Amino acid sequence: MNSPVTDVNALGADEVIVATGATANKIPVKGAETAIQAVDFLLGKQSVGEKVVIIGGGLTGCEIAYELYLQGKKPMIVEMMDDLIVTPGVCLANTSFLRDFFEANKVPVYLETGVTEIGEGTVTIKDKDGNLTTLEADNVILSVGYKPAPVAQKDKHIHVIGDANKVGNLRSVIWGAWDTCMKL
């Protein structure tokens, strides 16, 4: 144990459950390597300054913006879609609250907008009409989703579950694990 698994069949187990999670998506934008990954911020590995641009208006990005606002900071959300938190299955009360909160507290939300460059203290964004805007930012947080990171593929006795199989939320991964375990 405490070593990378390179061949799950070599473990000699009757059944193997792979629950290795997911890795953060990256964006092909100049300067993106200087941004903080959402998970690193959430785990307290990196702190942020006053003005923070959050790239990604999904549930995680919106919750980060909400928390930053409560800390007295100035979050700004940049989202490529035409609305925040478009993932199906997210609690409507939560999504409605966050949208209303951002509107009531004048948190800048840029919808249908992409990032063209992350610079020193700035983020350049481009809206659907091609207009460029430069935002001042002490920090940038990337919250652009995750992709499965399995160490093995499904097989008769290999069960890939949770985010290693399909990125979801806490409910979906727990229910999926329960379903798999009940079949063993």
Give the residues covered by each predicted segment:
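Glycine-rich dinucleotide-binding loop and its adjacent helix/turn
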Residues: M1, T6, T20-Q71, K156-N169
